[in-house]
Amino acid sequence: MAEKENLLHLDDNNFSTEIASGLVLVDFYATWCGPCRMLTPIVEQLAESEKGHAKIAKVDIDQAQETTANLQITSVPTLILFKEGKEVKRVVGVKDFDYLSELIKSHSE
């Protein structure tokens, strides 16, 4: 997968720091997950469109097992919106760009 400039890749070491401030939408995924692969271009598009408004990040559940366990991620893809380090919304499954963009906007104030 190509590295996108505005798309953060988080792991157990940097997760807490990166979600601590602002609005952050995190996509919990697995490389072996078909629906996760379908969601990737949508998440990449969000990273571009939300630049300056919200951070968009991905977490590979197989590489960040501690974070995944702490947040009780049981299905992928799972998207969690954090505001100032606190979870404000969790959605499971593939969602379209408009839904996710609206979700971010609804929590941006």
Region locations from a protein language model:
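Structural micro-motif
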Residues: 65, 71-80
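Short pre-active-site segment immediately N-terminal to redox-active cysteine/selenocysteine motifs
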Residues: 22, 29-32, 75
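Conserved acidic residues
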Residues: 11, 60-62
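N-terminal leader/targeting and pre-domain segments
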Residues: 1-22, 106-109
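Non-catalytic, surface beta->alpha helical segment in thiol-disulfide oxidoreductase systems
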Residues: 75, 83-109
